[in-house]
Amino acid sequence: TMHLNWLPKERQLITLCLKPKQLPQEEADFIATKFDNTIICKNENELLDLFLKFIEDADILSGWNSEGFDIPYVVNRTIQVLGKSETARFCLWEKFPRKRQYVKFGNEQETYDLIGRVHLDYLELYRKYTYHEMHSYRLDAIGEHEIGEKKIPYEGTLDQLYNSDFEKFIAYNRQDTALLAKLDEKLKFIDLANELAHANTVLLPTTMGAVAVTEQAI
């Protein structure tokens, strides 16, 4: 699910999904009609191609813990399903995402930097621009603390939810993205990072790592 904030409000939340194999097509299509702007794709090729078309106009991509999960996952799936040449669509100027290793909580992780298009991990924005320590930095906990909303609860694994209750799976996915959009609507940390970058004549991602830049701006 994506939230495209440059679209009219009723079209901003868009969900692309594949139906569970055992679910009849007619039933999957009916479930999709219960949600706005929800598209059942024929296969993963179509899903990834549509996703890349939707983000074409995006200057900034953001997600919760997206540096360590969403970005590497979707770039790697694009390589495997569509081919490496298609990953240039994540970037500008016909460049390709650049693989980068980094250490988080003592563990080495791998992500991709998107050339020409900015990616800001909202979890890292939240940790950087709030001045209180939270017991948990899960989206569920932050959503409840900041806007009084939580993720949709479910039992078992996400894979089990997908196969046993496709409607709830879609609702869960959409709520995750809606939570993030509402958080930024309140906190405006993407705007803050943008203002700091312009004020200090640095690239947006620099505001995530350069303490001196932030202190100078404040």
At which residue positions do the language-model features occur?
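Entry/capping segment at the start of metal-dependent catalytic domains
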Residues: T1-K9
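Conserved DEDDh/DEDDy metal-dependent 3′-5′ exonuclease domain
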Residues: T15-E133
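Generic recognition of stable, solvent-exposed alpha-helical segments in well-folded globular domains
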Residues: E46, L50-K53, F69-Y73, R117, ...
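Intrinsically disordered or highly flexible coil/loop and linker segments, enriched in small
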Residues: D57-L61, Y131-H135, I152-P153, A178-L179, ...
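Acidic carboxylate-rich catalytic motifs and surrounding loops in phosphoryl-/glycosyl-chemistry enzymes
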Residues: S66, L123-L125, G156-L158, N194-H198
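Phosphate/oxyanion-binding loops and surfaces in catalytic or ligand/nucleic-acid-binding neighborhoods
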Residues: V81, H145-E149, I190
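C-terminal or mid-to-C-terminal helical accessory/interaction module adjacent to the motor/catalytic core
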Residues: Y129, M134-E167, N173
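Common nucleic-acid-contacting/processivity interface regions adjacent to the catalytic cores
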Residues: D159-I218
